[in-house]
């Protein structure tokens, strides 16, 4: 498989990989770090390690009115597919098993309920709650 980004370790460390959600016509680079400036550019890893490692990877992105980033995340349903491609080009498929809203101080979303888990989060349209999507690796 092809490498997604430059081959230097320094450049590789900037990215987690790519997220692809065909149902929503989403394909974005995911930054390996999280801050407000990076969130304006693309989704960011909020919590977790590498995709190849066991545990929960949390990815956060803005919910813009023009449907950029995670603006349509609320359209996802249980059993929908999310693809992640890591920095080395390895593809991982995740199946959604839960979707809910919570407040922005609920850090239970970081807990891993599965061996390999993916959590997506964004604000809802009123910006009062967070939309949470939980998925397990297929």
Spans of model-derived segments:
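Solvent-exposed, non-transmembrane regions of membrane-associated and secreted proteins
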Residues: 1-138
């Amino acid at each position: 498989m092809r490498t997604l980004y430059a081959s230097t370790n320094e450049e590789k460390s900037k990215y987690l990989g790519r997220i692809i959600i065909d149902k929503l016509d989403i394909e974005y680079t995911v930054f390996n770090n999280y801050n407000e400036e990076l969130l304006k550019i693309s989704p960011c890893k909020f919590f977790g390690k590498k995709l190849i490692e066991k545990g929960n990877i949390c990815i956060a992105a803005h919910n813009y009115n023009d449907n950029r980033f995670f603006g349509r995340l609320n359209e996802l349903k249980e059993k929908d597919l999310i693809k992640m491609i890591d920095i080395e080009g390895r593809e991982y498929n995740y199946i959604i098993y839960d979707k809910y809203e919570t407040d922005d101080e609920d850090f239970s979303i970081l807990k891993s309920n599965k061996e390999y888990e993916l959590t997506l989060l964004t604000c809802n349209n009123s910006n009062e709650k967070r939309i949470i999507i939980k998925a397990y690796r297929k």
